[in-house]
A protein has these predicted regions:
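Hydrophobic/aromatic-lined pockets within catalytic cores
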Residues: 1, 11-15, 48-56, 89-92, ...
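Class II aminoacyl-tRNA synthetase-like tRNA-binding/catalytic domains
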Residues: 1-34, 191
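Active-site lining segments that contact anionic ligands and/or coordinate catalytic metals
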Residues: 3, 24-26, 119-122, 147-149, ...
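A generic structural motif
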Residues: 28-39, 156-158
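A residue-level signal for conserved active-site and pocket-lining positions in enzyme catalytic cores
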Residues: 29, 84, 125, 162, ...
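Hydrophobic face of alpha-helices
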Residues: 41-48, 169, 208
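Metal-assisted phosphate- and nucleotidyl-transfer catalytic regions
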Residues: 43-155, 178-191, 195-196
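Active-site pocket scaffolds in enzymes
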Residues: 163-164, 169-222
Length: 222
């Protein structure tokens, strides 16, 4: 089972930066009956390959006018979150200040590193810390400090967040309890898991960020 959606997203977060909008367009993909979160990454890779091919074939004139050189999505490397932090800290002599998230500068340096070392325009950063991800993100059974999730960086900017979700009802309740959250108001959501839910996952692509990086703009509002 697969669900695809293009729709507006409204976010109550700080947006006085070059990369944030409080209203943006999201391309959402959700997949059921998966064996691994890597299937979701493979699906996004295929989507990007299709999208770049379509742009090249149908919009060559517009790309020439805008002086856009399409990125290479034929192969997208992946690196664990903790490994990525260590790589850029060592390579660029940078101190790790936040062990639970990537700072914008770190994202840019990861993109730079993989461009220099592998000539890659995109890179998946996987296994984000559980503290950073929503309660429904599935923890890595081999190390529950991390999750079976990922971000996709395009030229050093996060354009996608995705991963595998918890599908077991009791595991979901435990995660909610461990987070100190209340289930009040979530009954309808939780009931769908009580009666059975297949292993599933998905992702969201920020369309404005993707477009910004394709055009080489410095500000998402442009």
């Amino acid at each position: 089972d697969r669900v695809f959606e293009t729709g507006p997203v409204f976010r109550a977060e700080k947006h006085n930066t070059k990369r944030h909008l409080n209203e943006y367009t999201s391309l959402d993909f959700e997949m059921g009956y998966i064996d691994s979160f890597e299937e979701i990454m493979a699906m996004e890779t295929g989507f990007l390959q299709y999208a770049m091919k379509l742009l090249k074939e149908d919009y060559a004139k517009e790309l020439e006018i805008l002086k856009v050189e399409l990125p290479d999505a034929s192969r997208i490397p992946a690196v664990r979150f903790d490994v990525a932090k260590e790589l850029v800290a060592k390579k660029y002599n940078r101190q790790i200040r936040n062990p639970f998230d990537l700072e914008p500068e770190e994202e840019a340096l990861i993109g730079q590193y993989f461009k220099e070392e592998y000539n890659a325009d995109f890179v998946f950063v996987t296994h984000y810390p559980s503290k950073k991800r929503p309660f429904y993100a599935m923890d890595d059974p081999e190390d529950t400090r991390f999750t079976l999730s990922f971000d996709l960086l395009f030229h050093g900017l996060e354009i996608t967040t995705g991963g595998q979700r918890i599908h077991d009802y009791n595991a979901l309740l435990k995660k909610i309890e461990d987070r100190g959250m209340e289930t009040e108001g979530m009954e309808q959501y939780l009931d769908t898991f009580k009666y059975g839910m297949p292993p599933h996952g998905g992702l969201g692509i920020g369309l404005e960020r993707l477009t910004m990086q394709l055009l080489g703009e410095e500000n998402v509002r442009e």
